[in-house]
């Protein structure tokens, strides 16, 4: 009873704190003069991290096993892993572009975990026989960490696509406008004003374009590093799961829905990493592949749990009747 009460308190503290954090982020985006509030949001993230950590320790102590046996526990652990990902740029003293992804991702996963949909999983239960193995912590934790990193990297690639799409859209808009000017002889009328500002345009660098270039390069670098880490963790998790499957079911691979989608996910991100080595594919094409991988990883992690089919259906749930 004590552990259950402690877990309930810590869960709601973390959710309340992270709700305040996301509110502060929205305020600082809308009102730039209040940029000093960002320090408060970082303190809130620290409080959230320790609350989630306390919950996981309490659940581990009360259940006697690593808290990754169902969807509720995995979502809480995913929030914890996303915060770890959030702190990586701070350790390296670099610009934290990842926070734009990890902060909302944390509140979404934490919000869903504490919603009424997973009430049946809030109480700790005894592990099913197939999960009573020393491989539980190694395999499931590595897979969960890979999900967290692979959910953090691809959105940065998607941001690159959006920035470049907007640039191309403006380019074609200007090109169409130039055609109209030539057709209706508007270019002669604007010649005087264009000539007068020609010196400024040639001598002063295009700061917005230079900023966009720096931003896309930084996003591309972070996306590549995060996805590379996630791919490594995913590979280790799949290999560990294969060994565990052989012990539990007598076969290394069963083409279970979860295993199939894990293989598809691994293949997509392997193609992404390979595309980075090809000059013609590096950039927009590789970013598109990473964006596709983002959708695939959600199906692999969350979709199979919703369906509740196959050998990996321990984390599935049913809606609680009202």
From Swiss-Prot:
The family note in this entry says: Belongs to the CcmF/CycK/Ccl1/NrfE/CcsA family.
Q: What is its main location?
A: plastid
| Record-linked HAMAP family | CytC_CcsA
Q: Does the keyword Protein biosynthesis apply?
A: no
Residue ranges of the TM segments? 9-29, 44-64, 143-163, 226-246, 259-276, 289-309
Name of protein: Cytochrome c biogenesis protein CcsA
On subunit structure and binding partners, the annotation says: May interact with Ccs1.
Q: What is the membrane topology noted in the UniProt record heading this document?
A: Multi-pass membrane protein
Single annotated GO MF: heme binding
Organism this protein belongs to: Triticum aestivum (Wheat)
Query: What cellular-component terms does GO give this entry?
Result: chloroplast thylakoid membrane
Summarizing the function annotation, the protein's role is:
Required during biogenesis of c-type cytochromes (cytochrome c6 and cytochrome f) at the step of heme attachment.
